[in-house]
UniProtKB/Swiss-Prot annotation:
Lineage: Eukaryota, Fungi, Dikarya, Ascomycota, Saccharomycotina
InterPro entries in the cross-refs: ATPase_NBD, Heat_shock_70_CS, HSP70_C_sf, HSP70_peptide-bd_sf, Hsp_70_fam
Protein name (Swiss-Prot/TrEMBL): Heat shock protein homolog SSE1
Keywords, in A-Z order: Acetylation, ATP-binding, Calmodulin-binding, Chaperone, Cytoplasm, Isopeptide bond, Nucleotide-binding, Phosphoprotein, Stress response, Ubl conjugation
Phosphothreonine, modified sites: T242
GO cellular component: cytoplasm; cytosol; nucleus
Biased composition (Basic and acidic residues): 673-687
Chain intervals for the UniProt region annotation (Disordered): 653-693
Keyword Transcription: no
Length: 693
């Protein structure tokens, strides 16, 4: 049975949650952290994923890829590329499809991976984390992504999940997942005809900022308006601090960290920590040892200075709030509560700016780091056939308007807007077109100016075939079921021809009609389904052949990672055995080995140790196993003697304890019998006495 799994795919850290035991739990990783760094690194033999990748980032900086969600679907020539590239330490390259990939050195060779592949590697890692925690099969996942993600980016994430061996039951907007988390845990929401509770959610994470206005009633939520600033997040604060110190240290220490990626990354990491310290303190020291050229750097920063550094960012706080309220057709006064989520909302000056934008105090009833993952896990559980969850209905809204167009055959019109921006999804629309034969359709963004420059206008296209004209007709009506699915992806679910036929329907008899009254009929025209048509879709999703190729590649790398981990484990086991056995041979095992055995085994241990630190330092799993078994063949004999003697001692102790217990029981029994006998004698003496008075 699969455990429903929710993934908050963060730019800096990701959070995992599962639905189980009538609740939703956060999954901790291998080092017991409640979030996992969204990092993929590459080494001489294997990949470094999550915590390992983060730990090795400074020493493996050119072969470590972070900020994964920012290059998903990113065109190499997109205006955003220049802004994104400054956050990457690995080399970004243009792929054959004009998208952005990363070039790294892996297993001694140069490799280029697409953003989808990199995301798949990380998702595969967190899938294993959930599997280790739950001890269950993991197949279904709901992944939370930013609302500003385009159709292409959502397909890329879904494909990444499939490459990782998962079924993406839903790609959900992250702030909507937080809203679901709010709705399922709140017990005081209005019901029935009561006025809905209006809640604004402000989510500022590592790289982007979203404001969403939602209406809540018990068991349901409806998104009313959403707006984003995709270049406003915690990393921008970190970068501002880093650039400040880069200038200061250039003057103060005559070093330029901008020329040294490792040094720059160390200052950036320290800047992130400083930012967090300043959230609780008005001043904080800053220092990094041997940052470059053996130079130690130190300084300090005040909260006031930080606010001045990020002043251009703070001036943009109100814009998403204003836009979200406008789309929701509400004023700030009509908002009942303002919930803040995302790690960056802990910054005091940001809190103040958000509060001022709404003119009311902020609420923190949700866990700022975990609400999205928990909501995603609940949504995944809704799709599970094996779990029963409380009913909860939610509707999101289209961030961009989408129109459908078709070959012009009969109609004057050849396109129409089907899903306007701000309309709810999932949703289905039926349209009818008169067709003269097979035709094609396409879905496109209605107003490309709503999207970032260079975004592909067309979302998908379809070929509809199998149209048969009835004899004597020059066209046939075709009904199409257009769908925006729960993940926000646009499809044509069904296409079929229809025809009008005449049928006879009985005319209802009057209530006072006699029982033998003759039934009369009338002819009516009904529209009925005639022939199903074939739909061939061309979307941003990977075709089956390419998907299978990438699945195979991922499985090969996964097998290599596993082999390297097992080899390292065997190596460590051998090393530990050498030291442990050598120590025991001189102590507790000494009486149980002959001088010849000791000499032989000591020689074997010395030889194995020399091999381990020489040619065996980088050997294969089988050789480590063979060396271990060679030592154990003699070591286990001596150990067996020791254990046998220990067992004899234990048995002797047990026998002594048993004998002592038996003696004690016998003594106790004898005492009881003596007491009983004395009691009987005393009774007998009492009965023999005669009162002479």
């Amino acid at each position: 049975m699969s455990t429903p799994f929710g993934l908050d795919l963060g730019n800096n850290n990701s959070v995992l949650a599962v639905a189980r035991n009538r609740g939703i739990d956060i999954v901790v990783n291998e080092v017991s952290n409640r979030s996992t760094p969204s990092v993929v690194g590459f080494g001489p033999k294997n990949r470094y994923l999550g915590e390992t990748g983060k730990n090795k980032q400074t020493s493996n900086i050119k072969n470590t890829v972070a900020n994964l969600k920012r290059i998903i679907g990113l065109d190499y020539h997109h205006p955003d590329f220049e802004q994104e590239s400054k956050h990457f330490t690995s080399k970004l390259v243009e792929l054959d499809d004009k998208k952005t990939g990363a070039e790294v050195r892996f297993a001694g060779e140069k490799h280029v991976f697409s953003a989808t592949q990199l995301a798949a590697m990380f998702i595969d890692k967190v899938k294993d984390t959930v599997k280790q925690d739950t001890k269950a099969n993991i197949t279904d996942v709901c992944i939370a992504v930013p609302p500003w993600y385009t159709e292409e980016q959502r397909y890329n994430i879904a494909d990444a999940a499939r490459i990782a061996g998962l079924n993406p039951v839903r790609i959900v907007n992250d702030v909507t997942a937080a809203g679901v988390s709010y709705g399922i845990f709140k017990t005081d929401l209005p019901e029935g005809e009561e006025k809905p509770r209006i809640v604004a959610f402000v989510d500022i994470g590592h790289s982007s900022y979203t404001c969403s206005i939602m209406a809540f009633k018990k068991g349901q939520l409806k998104v009313l308006g959403t707006a984003c600033d995709k270049h406003f997040g915690g990393r921008d604060f970190d970068l501002a601090i880093t650039e400040h110190f880069a200038d200061e240290f250039k003057t103060k220490y005559k070093i330029d960290i901008r020329e040294n990626p490792k040094a720059y990354n160390r200052i950036l990491t320290a800047a992130e920590k400083l930012k967090k310290v300043l959230s609780a303190n008005t001043n904080a020291p800053f220092s990094v040892e041997s940052v470059m050229n053996d130079v130690d750097v130190s300084s300090q920063l005040s909260r006031e200075e930080l606010e001045e550094l990020v002043k251009p960012l703070l001036e943009r706080v109100t814009e998403p709030v204003t836009k979200a309220l406008a789309q929701a057709k509400l004023s700030a006064e009509e908002v009942d509560f303002v919930e803040i989520i995302g790690g960056t909302t802990r910054i005091p000056t940001l809190k103040q700016s958000i509060s001022e934008a709404f003119g009311k105090p902020l609420s923190t009833t949700l866990n700022q780091d975990e609400a999205i993952a928990k909501g995603a896990a609940f949504i995944c559980a809704i799709h599970s056939p094996t779990l029963r969850v409380r009913p909860f209905k939610f509707e999101d809204i289209h961030p961009y308007s989408v129109s459908y167009s078709w070959d012009k055959q009969v109609e004057d019109e050849d396109h129409m807007e089907v899903f306007p921006a701000g309309s709810s999804f999932p949703s289905t629309k039926l349209i009818t077109l008169n067709r003269t034969g097979d035709f094609s359709m396409a879905a496109s963004y209605t107003d490309i100016t709503q999207l970032p420059p260079n975004t592909p206008e067309q979302i998908a296209n379809w070929e509809i075939t199998g149209v048969q004209l009835p004899e004597g007709q020059d066209s046939v009506p075709v009904k199409l079921k257009l769908r925006c699915d729960p993940s926000g992806l646009h499809t044509i679910e069904e296409a079929y021809t229809i025809e009008d036929i005449e049928v006879e329907e009985p005319i209802p008899l009057p209530e006072d009609a006699p029982e033998d009254a003759e039934q009369e009929f009338k002819k009516v025209t009904k529209t009925v389904k005639k022939d199903d048509l074939t739909i061939v879709a061309h979307t941003f999703g990977l075709d089956a052949k390419k998907l299978n190729e990438l699945i195979e590649k991922e499985n090969e790398m996964l097998a290599q990672d596993k082999l390297v981990a097992e080899t390292e484990d065997r190596k460590n086991t051998l090393e530990e055995y050498i030291y442990t056995l050598r120590g025991k041979l001189e102590e507790e095992y000494a009486p149980f080995a002959s001088d010849a055995e000791k000499t032989k085994l000591q020689g074997m241990l010395n030889k194995a140790e020399e091999w381990l630190y020489d040619e065996g330092f980088d050997s294969i799993k089988a050789k480590y196993i063979a060396k271990y078994e060679e030592l154990a063949s003699l070591g286990n004999i001596i150990r067996g003697r020791y254990l046998a003697k220990e067992e004899e001692k234990k048995q002797a102790i047990r026998s002594k304890q048993e004998a002592s217990q038996m003696a004690a029981m016998a003594e106790k029994l004898a005492a009881q019998r003596k007491a009983e006998a004395e009691k009987k004698e005393e009774k007998k003496d009492t009965e023999g006495d005669v009162d002479m008075d």
